[in-house]
């Protein structure tokens, strides 16, 4: 049973999570190994990309560069290099005619050439002869290779198989001076015809080429015989082929070197071939409009020379699509599928594969022109069925007629009917990328639709599909687009959507359904499908308002960021723009609300935009393929109007980060996104770094005395957000899919206006002045702070999401240039926790300060005065060179005031310090002076999170508790202006130390006045930790002022039973009647599965009188969740045993609780490793490492005495 609510988002409490998502330490001689990337699962799992080629004649033959007038200086895209000049190679054999680049002359600044000697300008040839499918092929595959040998590669433009000036107008360039830089003529006019000429371009200087559409006369152009002088009245033709990747003339930017000395043009499919598995869907080439659906042309697979399955490593790919030594493309990489279709057709099918189909579709000489009708919604439905594993629709793939007719319908490629399962891993992301024109035809024969006008009989397999009703889904989308209910339903069943051929927008209904509802209930978690689409804009028709474009609707509703708690069936309100329109762009530069370009929608209005769109789509696709979230923070602890939740995300495909703000519904608690992190232009961003005692702008000229002194201006600008130098060729910088780096362990921190009532009863120095300070700051801009692995602390306006400033700590600089490298492997930079507080400065008065750590990113600690977020000030920026005891601080720094009046930062030093031991670090917040309190000299150790305690409940800290990685819990006492340390307890199991990673939690038992400390043991810092199955434990200790000698003075609590209640894995614990002298312990051993390495690496928390603990059970057998599963447990804090009444409501919210074999449930299982839960009212939300959230009801009042408890609000019981 699936209990997940939304994805991707990881939820956790405000308490620090140690080791939940782990990363690199950046330490040269690290004693404690810390992984360089997150360990919580899905690492290196390849994504699935299905390419939907809605290729019929407009997609193939439409003009790519739409401008009818050639403009010198404007770059036009196609197979030719705009920065090269070409000559034409004539041969009596047509197949041997082509253009080839020349080393000299070189193009002029406006892409023109000195055309004497038979030279042509490559930029002009792109404008003149490029069809829409050409840049699509170029971007995806490198282009259609008509000749592909070790020594030579020649590309050929798409076939233009019919007369159609509407799709490719006949053009003219006028003016001898202009033409002299483009073509080798002395003409005043250069008239061009492409339509109806196959792979050729015809030209003349006279209008007969235009006025006579039946003109078939054209002499093959030969520069040695045709000087094209001023009086030439001839009509000539050239074959539009071009030699590429010729080292003698300079390599194009997409040429890749191979071991045998060849260079081959490659595209995005090859570039991402190690990270994505591909499949392709297309149509049968049948000209009847009564032919339904699409067919699978190439099944989901790796296309490169090796497969890259994480559990197998690199292995030779038996279905590779190119030679690893030469780069030459194979004609038939999937011979089994070709042979199967051969048997059905009765004629040899000799071509197969993803790249081949994309390149050769419409190019094969089967004796039939390209397809006329395009039922695109049914094509999408074919892919929809593939991912849902519903099986092929036989009527879609049937081949009929004679052998030749079957061959033509197959278009000389496989028509695959024995579908496999494209989803190999439950955590794979699945993506569709489509291309087509909006003038679609007869595509309504889908589940739920009863309008059969101009449709054949609906296939029985389609009738049997009850998983979707496209009419209801479409009506729902129209409601979300603002229609009234009746109008929406009327539109959903209308005979046509936006064209006269009885088309529909059901592609959007399918895309929405697949994007928001689990496609595969048989697999763990939710399997969803994200849609990207390229509109080729047939005949320049953008379909404005854009909501009349079915591809825009499909990309919007199949690609929006699904909010937390989203109900895909009941939602009818408009989507928040923050979920689908973050690019700020408009279709066709039409600055109107009805022309906003959805993030996953791209237009091929010209070839330049086509290529840019596809590159952007792939960068987003790769980012989505490994998407996950970090955690949630809030601007309020109460559910009321104005409450906002902030979610940090990372996308490991390109290591991009994001921050999203959600409005919280005050009645239901539902989240509605209203902004994403957004940035000023890179030149205008406020980015600072510490130079001695002041802040300076993060620019090349200011960094000469830092670890970035060797960086180039391009690298520094890249770090600032300049993306103009990104690319995959030498000299370029790493391609990103966004400006901000991934956010993994840094919890977003909201800092709003001060609370003037905070210190009304306090009597320490400055307390009486706080109310005035709060009043002065009442209207300051609220800010959300978060650290990212781009080397920066980011500060965002909490109302708008716009970045106010960023800060680069010194400790992040030494390895920051790696972030710009094309071969970048994940690094951690500013990955630590943040804290903020108002402190009193006897000289300047009250100030708001922020303290941050680098966590896994390095050994650094910094403090900023953020009283005025628009004018921050540096307090200090420290590294381990300043504080010798500082290691990788993996916990939240705490700000506290001690009895001497000093405001201090308290934190555990973390592992990998210079001395390699555990120390408490106490820093004067105003001066940066650090005191180090070592607790032992034992190496391979570090102090974890600290729990400050005010024994007098006056806000003055006089005691601190913290554990270390060798299992000792320490008590630090501040007296006589000094810190004294003593061990309280050492956690062991059968004599072996149990590491303490999480911050302990304290409480006073009201009935006895005894001080209790609660914590669990275990760690998860490296893959070795994940393999470790040693027993860890949960402890509740009484601090009686002396060291607890061992377990003999503690009572034992056991996990006594496990089972399933209403689909939930549950467990119960024992109910001890006698409490040990010094507390209790519970070994995390399953009564059914035994020792599994279950551990507790996140802090405990209170919910009323219940103690909440979260455990994790690692599982290296599942690549999707290496951190495994776990339990959220609720027990009596002062006995360690089960509660006297139910805590988890497992009976469908009925309030009757849950019991296992008559005993109240003590723990609920989560299929992916859980984080600390978050409570909203009586709803408990459990965020897990796989990005899912499980929601359960808990008691709202009564015996559990529900109150919010923190270290300042101490729990006391009667």
From Swiss-Prot:
Compartments, record wording: Fimbrium
Any single GO CC term annotated in Swiss-Prot or TrEMBL for this entry: pilus
User: Which residues fall in a compositionally biased region of kind Polar residues?
Assistant: 443-460
Annotated signal peptide: 1-30
- Indicate the family of this protein: Belongs to the PilY1 family.
What is this protein's expression induced by? Answer: Expression is not affected by calcium.
Looking at the record's lineage, which domain of life comes first? Bacteria
InterPro entries in alphabetical order: PilY1_beta_prop_dom, Quinoprotein_ADH-like_sf
Per its database record, what is this protein's job?
Answer: One of the three PilY1 homologs of X.fastidiosa, which are involved in bacterial twitching motility as component of the filamentous type IV pili (T4P).
| Principal location listed in the UniProt entry | other
One Gene Ontology term of the molecular function aspect: metal ion binding
What happens in the null mutant?
Shows twitching motility, but the speed of the twitching movement is three times slower than wild-type on a glass surface against the flow direction of media. Mutant cells also move more sporadically with frequent stop intervals. Forms T4P. Not impaired in attachment to surfaces or biofilm formation.
UniProt binding sites for Ca(2+)? 952, 954, 956, 958
Keywords associated with the record: Calcium, Fimbrium, Fimbrium biogenesis, Metal-binding, Signal
Q: What is this protein called?
A: Type IV pilus biogenesis factor PilY1 homolog PD_0023
Q: Which parts of this chain are annotated as the region Disordered?
A: 307-334, 438-460
Question: Keyword 4Fe-4S, does the record have it?
Answer: no
Q: Where is the composition biased (Basic and acidic residues)?
A: 311-322
């Amino acid at each position: 049973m699936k209990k997940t609510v939304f994805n991707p988002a990881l939820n956790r409490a405000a308490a620090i999570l140690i080791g939940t998502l782990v990363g690199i330490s950046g330490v040269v001689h690290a004693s404690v190994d810390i992984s360089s990337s997150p360990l919580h699962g899905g690492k290196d799992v390849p994504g699935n990309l299905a390419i939907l080629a809605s290729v019929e004649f407009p997609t193939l033959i439409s003009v790519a560069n739409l401008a009818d007038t050639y403009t010198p200086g404007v770059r036009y895209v196609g197979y030719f290099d705009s920065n090269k000049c070409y000559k034409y190679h004539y041969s009596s054999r047509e197949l041997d005619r082509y253009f080839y680049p020349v080393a000299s002359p070189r193009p002029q600044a406006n892409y023109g050439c000195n055309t004497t000697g038979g030279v042509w300008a490559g930029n002009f040839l792109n404008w003149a002869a490029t069809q829409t499918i050409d840049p699509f092929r170029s971007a995806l595959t490198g282009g259609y290779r008509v000749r592909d040998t070790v020594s030579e590669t020649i590309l050929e433009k798409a076939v233009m198989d019919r007369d159609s000036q509407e799709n490719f107008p006949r053009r003219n360039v006028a003016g001898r001076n202009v033409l002299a830089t483009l073509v080798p003529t002395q003409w005043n006019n250069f008239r061009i015809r492409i339509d109806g000429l196959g792979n050729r371009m015809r030209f003349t200087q006279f209008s007969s080429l235009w006025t006579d559409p039946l003109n078939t006369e054209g002499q093959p152009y030969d520069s040695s015989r045709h000087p094209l002088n001023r009086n030439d009245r001839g009509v000539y033709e050239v074959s539009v082929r071009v030699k590429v990747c010729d080292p003698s003339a300079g390599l194009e930017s997409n040429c890749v070197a191979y071991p045998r000395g060849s260079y081959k043009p490659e595209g995005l499919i090859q570039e991402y071939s190690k990270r994505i598995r591909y499949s392709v869907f297309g149509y049968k080439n049948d000209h009847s409009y009564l032919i339904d659906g699409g067919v699978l042309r190439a099944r989901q697979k790796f296309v490169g020379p090796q497969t890259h399955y994480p559990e197998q490593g690199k292995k030779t790919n038996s279905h590779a699509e190119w030679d690893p030594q030469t780069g030459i493309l194979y004609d038939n990489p999937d011979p089994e599928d070709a042979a199967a279709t051969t048997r059905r057709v009765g004629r040899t099918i000799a071509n197969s594969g993803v790249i081949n189909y994309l390149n050769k579709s419409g190019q094969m000489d089967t004796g039939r022109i390209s397809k006329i009708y395009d039922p695109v919604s049914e094509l999408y439905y074919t892919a929809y069925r593939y991912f849902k594993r519903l099986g092929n629709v036989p009527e879609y793939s049937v081949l009929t007629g004679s052998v030749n007719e079957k061959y033509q319908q197959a278009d000389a490629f496989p028509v695959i009917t024995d579908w496999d399962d494209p989803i190999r891993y439950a955590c794979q992301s699945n993506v569709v990328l489509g291309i087509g024109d909006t003038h679609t035809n007869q595509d309504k024969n889908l589940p739920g639709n009863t309008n059969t006008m101009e449709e054949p009989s609906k296939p029985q397999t389609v009738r049997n599909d009850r998983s979707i009703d496209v009419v209801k889904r479409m009506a729902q989308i129209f409601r979300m687009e603002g229609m009234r209910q009746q109008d929406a339903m009327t539109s959903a069943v209308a005979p046509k959507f936006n064209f006269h051929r009885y088309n529909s927008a059901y592609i959007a209904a399918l895309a929405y359904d697949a994007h928001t509802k689990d496609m595969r209930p048989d697999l763990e978690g939710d399997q969803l499908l994200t849609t990207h689409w390229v509109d080729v804009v047939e005949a320049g028709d953008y379909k404005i308002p854009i909501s009349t474009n079915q591809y825009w609707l499909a990309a919007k509703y199949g690609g929006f960021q699904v909010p937390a708690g989203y109900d895909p069936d009941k939602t009818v309100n408009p989507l928040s723009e923050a979920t689908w329109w973050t690019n700020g762009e408009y279709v066709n530069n039409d600055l109107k609300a009805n022309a906003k370009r959805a993030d996953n929608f791209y237009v091929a209005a010209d070839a330049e935009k086509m290529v840019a769109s596809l590159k952007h789509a792939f960068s987003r696709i790769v980012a989505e393929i490994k998407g996950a979230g970090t955690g949630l923070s809030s601007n309020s602890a109460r559910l009321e109007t104005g409450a906002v939740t902030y979610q940090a995300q990372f996308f490991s495909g390109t290591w991009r980060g994001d921050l999203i703000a959600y409005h919280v519904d005050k009645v239901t608690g539902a989240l509605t996104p209203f902004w994403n992190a957004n940035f000023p232009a890179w030149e205008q961003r406020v980015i600072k770094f510490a130079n001695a005692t002041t802040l300076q702008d993060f620019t090349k000229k200011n960094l000469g005395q830092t670890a970035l002194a060797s960086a180039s201006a391009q690298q520094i600008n890249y770090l600032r957000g300049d993306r103009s130098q990104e690319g995959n060729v030498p000299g370029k910088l790493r391609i990103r899919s966004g400006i901000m780096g991934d956010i993994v362990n840094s919890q977003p921190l909201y800092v709003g206006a001060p609370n003037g009532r905070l210190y009304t009863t306090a009597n320490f120095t400055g307390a009486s002045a706080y109310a005035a300070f709060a009043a002065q700051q009442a209207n300051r801009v609220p800010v959300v702070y978060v650290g990212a692995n781009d080397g920066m602390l980011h500060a965002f306006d909490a109302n708008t999401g716009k970045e106010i400033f960023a800060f680069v700590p010194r400790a992040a600089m030494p390895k920051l240039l790696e972030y710009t490298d094309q071969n970048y492997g994940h690094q951690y930079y500013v990955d630590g926790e943040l804290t903020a507080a108002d402190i009193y400065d006897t000289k300047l008065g009250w100030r708001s300060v922020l303290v941050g750590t680098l966590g896994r990113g390095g050994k650094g600690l910094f403090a900023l005065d953020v009283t005025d977020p628009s004018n921050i000030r540096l307090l200090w920026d420290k590294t381990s060179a300043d504080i010798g005891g500082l290691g990788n601080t993996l916990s939240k720094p705490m700000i506290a005031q001690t009895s001497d009046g000093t405001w201090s930062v308290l934190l555990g030093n973390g592992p990998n310090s210079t001395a390699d031991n555990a120390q408490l670090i106490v820093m004067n917040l105003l001066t940066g002076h650090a005191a180090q309190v070592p607790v032992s000299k034992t190496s391979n150790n570090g102090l974890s999170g600290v729990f400050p305690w005010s024994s007098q409940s006056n806000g003055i800290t006089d005691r601190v508790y913290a554990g270390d990685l060798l299992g000792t819990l320490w008590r630090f006492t501040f007296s006589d202006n000094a810190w004294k340390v003593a061990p309280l307890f050492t956690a062991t199991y059968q004599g072996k130390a149990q590491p303490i990673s999480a911050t302990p939690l304290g409480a006073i038992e009201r009935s006895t006045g005894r001080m209790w400390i609660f914590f669990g043991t275990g760690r998860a810092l490296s893959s070795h930790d994940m393999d470790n199955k040693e027993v860890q434990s949960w402890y509740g200790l009484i601090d009686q002022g002396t060291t607890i000698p061992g377990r003999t003075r503690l009572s034992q609590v056991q996990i006594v039973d496990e089972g399933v209640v209403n689909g939930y894995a549950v467990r119960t614990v024992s109910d001890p009647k006698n409490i040990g002298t010094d507390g209790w312990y519970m070994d995390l051993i399953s009564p059914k599965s035994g020792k599994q390495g279950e551990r507790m690496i996140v802090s405990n928390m209170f919910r009323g009188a219940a103690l909440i603990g979260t455990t994790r059970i690692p599982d290296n057998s599942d690549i999707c969740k290496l951190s495994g599963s776990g339990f959220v447990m609720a027990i009596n804090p002062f006995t360690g045993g089960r509660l006297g009444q139910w805590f988890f409501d497992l009976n469908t919210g009925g309030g009757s609780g849950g019991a296992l074999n008559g005993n109240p449930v003590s723990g609920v299982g989560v299929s992916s490793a859980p984080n600390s839960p978050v409570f909203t009212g009586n709803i408990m939300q459990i965020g897990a490492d796989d990005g899912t959230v499980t929601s359960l009801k808990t008691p709202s009042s009564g015996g559990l005495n529900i109150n919010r408890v923190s270290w300042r609000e101490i729990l006391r019981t009667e």
